[in-house]
Amino acid sequence: MEKFTVHTGVVAPLDRENVDTDAIIPKQFLKSIKRTGFGPNAFDEWRYLDHGEPGQDNSKRPLNPDFVLNQPRYQGASVLLARKNFGCGSSREHAPWALQQYGFRAIIAPSFADIFFNNCYKNGLLPIVLTEQQVDHLFNDTYAFNGYQLTVDLDAQVVRTGDGREYPFEIAAFRKYCLLNGFDDIGLTLRHADKIRQFEAERLAKQPWLNNKLVG
């Protein structure tokens, strides 16, 4: 998993409340057994004018010019600004996969659905909770300035604006540690690979009838 320390990027304002996971990545794209390739279909039903299906050549599909991510001023955005209850609806880890593979590194909103919130951390995507008033200010700034950027400093736990304002945010110490070091669940486990191998060797010495090959 890619480390997250300090990130500066263009902000895209998604000015809708209760954006659910089916809007983030529609159900027909969940059939894949792979973990990659979801970025082109993030917000598929809002982003394109036709109905999307797996395997389509998205470069040939008609774009919805009114959708925020299709507007030239927000191209290359890596910080998503959203409204309350972002990521609600059915549980699907494909939602943070799609957002991350689109290019987002952080999402700022007044609140998130719990399961989506947790899934973001597991996939290197930083969900940041600010107050509704703070989010309103950021929406106003994003609309007012073309190419508006924010800096997210995870170590300092602040969101910085170009004019020097800082918005502190909370994050659990363990989650912060994992993001700063680029550790997902597998990465955390592999840090203890030597101890795991030692335990397995000792167990097999005591219980040789369980003689399976060691992993790694």
Swiss-Prot record:
Q: What EC identifiers does the entry list?
A: 4.2.1.33
Pathway linked to the protein: Amino-acid biosynthesis; L-leucine biosynthesis; L-leucine from 3-methyl-2-oxobutanoate: step 2/4
**Single GO MF annotation:** 3-isopropylmalate dehydratase activity
Main EC class the enzyme belongs to:
lyase
Q: Which reaction does it catalyse?
A: (2R,3S)-3-isopropylmalate = (2S)-2-isopropylmalate
* Record keyword Nuclease present: no
Keywords noted in UniProt: Amino-acid biosynthesis, Branched-chain amino acid biosynthesis, Leucine biosynthesis, Lyase
Q: Does the keyword Lyase apply?
A: yes
Q: Which SUPFAM superfamilies match?
A: LeuD/IlvD-like
> GO biological process: any one?
L-leucine biosynthetic process
Quote the cellular component terms of the Gene Ontology held in the record.
3-isopropylmalate dehydratase complex
For this chain, the family text in UniProt reads: Belongs to the LeuD family. LeuD type 1 subfamily.
Q: What does this protein do?
A: Catalyzes the isomerization between 2-isopropylmalate and 3-isopropylmalate, via the formation of 2-isopropylmaleate.
Q: How does it assemble?
A: Heterodimer of LeuC and LeuD.
Protein name per its UniProtKB record: 3-isopropylmalate dehydratase small subunit
Task: Give me the gene this protein comes from.
Answer: leuD
